[in-house]
Amino acid sequence: MLKRIGLELLHHIPFTAAGAVTGIAAMALVTLFNTPMNVSEALFFTFHPLHVVFSAMVTTAIFRRNKNSRLWLTIIVGYVGSVGVATLSDAIIPYLEGKSLQIDMEFHLPLISTEIMPYFNVPHWVIVNAAAIIGIIIGYFKPNTKFPHMIHVLISTWASLFGFTAFGTADWLPLLPVLFVFLFLAVWLPCCVSDIVFPLLWVKGEPAHAHH
């Protein structure tokens, strides 16, 4: 199993690198146009919930198809596999990476935040947890749904990107080369754990997502 996981991680390096390139391009535009932080925050809370939905769908569907388990256990697996991974990838890792560069970063956990989201007037935790519930429901009742891994990579990349610009203050342009590496790592390991390691743990055949 470890050999297969290693091969899958190597296989997904090009996907993740391509996603990181789009993230760096977006960050350059955000910097050049002096995009306000509240806009970055709104974008973060667009892509982060999408990331949660996608992860919840995949994780729940895999567990649902291959384990005849009780509903409560399926919900726990779907929730932890989505909110846990997305929080790590989109919030915790960008914060730690930003602090390692001595960037002024605000530590923010969306799944428990009571702050009101700009433009939507809804608490952050409501949006994130609702996204997880939606993903779990879809994965439970439509377990044969398949998505390209590249979609997950792009959504996660953009969520991580806006995790930097929404909660960090810095002159981003000189940092773009380093941030490319950081974006790559923030997406590659968590997303591959969610989309690859989970399938290899629960599925005896092919993973539940399609590689395109």
For each predicted feature, which ranges?
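N-terminal topogenic module of multi-pass integral membrane proteins
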Residues: M1-W72
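C-terminal transmembrane helix-loop-helix hairpin of multi-pass membrane proteins
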Residues: K3-G19, Y140-H212
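Transmembrane helix-loop junctions in multi-pass membrane proteins
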Residues: A26-V39, R65-S69, G84, L88-E97, ...
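Membrane-interface interhelical loops and short amphipathic "cap" helices
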Residues: T31-F44, E97-L109, W172-L179, F184
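Alpha-helical transmembrane segments of polytopic membrane proteins
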Residues: F44-S55, P118-N129, F182-V187
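Hydrophobic cores of alpha-helical transmembrane segments in multi-pass inner/ER membrane proteins
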Residues: V52-F63, N129-G135, F184, P190-L200
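Membrane-interface alpha-helices at helix entry/exit sites of multi-pass transporters
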Residues: N68-V77, H211
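Membrane-proximal helix-loop-helix units in multi-pass membrane proteins
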Residues: V80, G84-S160
